[in-house]
Amino acid sequence: MNKTKKPADRLIFHVDVNSAFLSWESARRMKEGLPDLRDIPACIGGDPAKRTGIVVAKSIPAKKCGVQTGEPVAMALRKCPNMVIVPSDFDLYVKCSRAFKKICASYTPVMESFSIDEVFLDMTGTSLLYPDPIAAAHEIKDRISDELGFTVNVGISTNKLLAKMASDFEKPNKVHTLFPEEIPAKMWPLPVRELLFLGKASEKKLTEAGIRTIGDLAHAWETDIQTLIGNKNGHQLYQYARGIDDSPVKAQPDEVKGFSAETTFNEDIVSIEQVDPILLAQCDIVAARMRRKKKKCTSVSITFRTLDFRNRSHQTKLPNATDITDEIYRCAKQLFRESWKGEPLRLIGVSVTGLTEDDFEQLSLFEDPEKKEKSRKLDAALDAIRQKYGNDKVTRASILNGAQGIARKAKAQMKNDAEN
């Protein structure tokens, strides 16, 4: 068997906000003299007055009462009747995410935004500025806590995999290392389910085969693992179990192959009158992104998640490439009506792919050129206003007149898109 690589010339940090949504709301409330949500039974998500929706995030005291992320608020309240419920605030999340990433970016020019609440930092070559990596990690952690009022974990290693595994060790407000020489003591005793990117289906197959720890996986024969869970997945997880990962920290994203927008809801979406404004807001977002990048799409797809967490999607090819919001919206509406059976929804998304340059357009005999030009001028006007005054400063009337809360979420999503 191959020995674990030790790429001593790399130094990678993974910075992860502890219970991000709950922490961000707590930081704001504490500035207002209110109790810290992290110290009391509390959750983010749902309508406090109606006691509806789902639990998006929970405090440790709420967790001790048996409250679980993703369960209905009504069920959580039966377990924890005195729990404080706070509705989601997407504007706040965007603001806090931007603030913590700004601090992280001040330590290295090579930062990869992995999600709204976590980043990778490539600290390779910073030894003159930060000769002690652990001290540098503590400095980042303490600055975020002191300046922003919430805590993070920082994982340190020689690659992204091990750095992220390290940041998931004891929480909150901790710095952990997981260097290759520490793998046998720190990582191999962990349950196999703790390995990054190992899903429930693979876990079930591995445990049934007697592979219960990450160490068991690392010391098995790779061909046996591939037989159990497939060649590609088996190879990757076998490498991960041995601490091998050569993926770079990407300061710039790969060439875009498509654009997408998704919205998760705390309450059930149950009517087409609620769905249409959501689809329009998302089509507005992806079309504006295409126009900024001077691209057009040739394919549109919609996706949605039901109350039992089942995902469904539907896709179609367009007769002509487009970047016009209204054309994408009409297509998305049709796709949704063809695939939705009326079951309650918790997530809706729109994506566009098959991108082409916007300097070529094939005309159709069946298109109304005047209507097309009118739509194009409307999009151009909205783009110009948003560029001058901010992405969140103008919203289509159909969105504002639609489902409650959709406009606010769409504006927050567009603001975040413009500033990243």
Each predicted region: which residue ranges?
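Short, hydrophobic beta-strand segments
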Residues: V119-G125, S313-T316, Q362-D368
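Short small-residue beta-strand/loop micro-motif enriched in glycine and branched aliphatics
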Residues: I85, R310-H314, D359-E361
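Short, charged/polar surface micro-motifs in flexible loops or helix N-caps
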Residues: N18-A20, P48-R51, L307-R310, L355-D358
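A glycine-rich phosphate-binding loop feature that marks nucleotide/adenosyl-phosphate handling sites
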Residues: T158-L161, A241-R242, K296-L307, L345-T356, ...
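Gly/Gly-Pro- and Ser/Thr-rich, intrinsically disordered tail segments characteristic of DNA damage-repair
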Residues: M1-Q236, R242, A288, K372-N420
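DNA-contacting surface of Y-family translesion DNA polymerases
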Residues: K5-P7, E194, S202-L345, D417-E419
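C-terminal hydrophobic structural anchor segments
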Residues: T322-D323, E327-Q387
